[in-house]
Amino acid sequence: MTAKILNLKNPDTYAENIKVAANALLSGKIVAFPTETVYGLGVCADNDIAIENLYRVKQRSKDKKLSIMISESEEVSKYVKHVPLIAEKLIGTFWPGPLTIILDLDDNSTVGLRNPDNRVIRDLINEVAVPIASTSANISGGSPAIDAQQVISNFSDKIDVVLDGGPAEAGNPSTVVKIWDDTYKIIRHGVIGKERLSRCLNEDCFSIGS
């Protein structure tokens, strides 16, 4: 069955459509939504079966982790005990916004966190009351979708709900930065350019390979 498209342009039905999408997430379904960059696909971050399904639908390698969308920057402390100064500076400057920060975890794995600056996804996170595991709305290796019709074209009956908020604001993906204590590396160039990152950090750290 083709995904249900929920139009968010009508303020009278906006809240109800957010609830419909939230209920879909809570029942293990995949939901597409606009962000301030491109359209994303998401599932509840605490649902392992839904995450497996998202990888399958996306045709994404398990080596490439999903981003975790959080509604408040303070939630970073739920994932890492020590937040490097570099991360604190970037969070203070660019969050909420189009920046994904990858941090080390105690078990030697990593987590990519993003605090988006888009009403729809923020309302959705707050409605489900858990972080959302997310990836761009395209088959792995393809171009990210920038509107609801492109999402449908990419996935059709493979996902469950599409929140149609009109064209994505930036049309380019978020910038992804891996952070160590005093070093960072740009993993993916995106909306926030290298120069803006450098100005923010004021040469207090070293950039490697970017």
Give a label for each model feature:
Residues 1-210:
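Active-site-adjacent structural elements in enzyme catalytic cores
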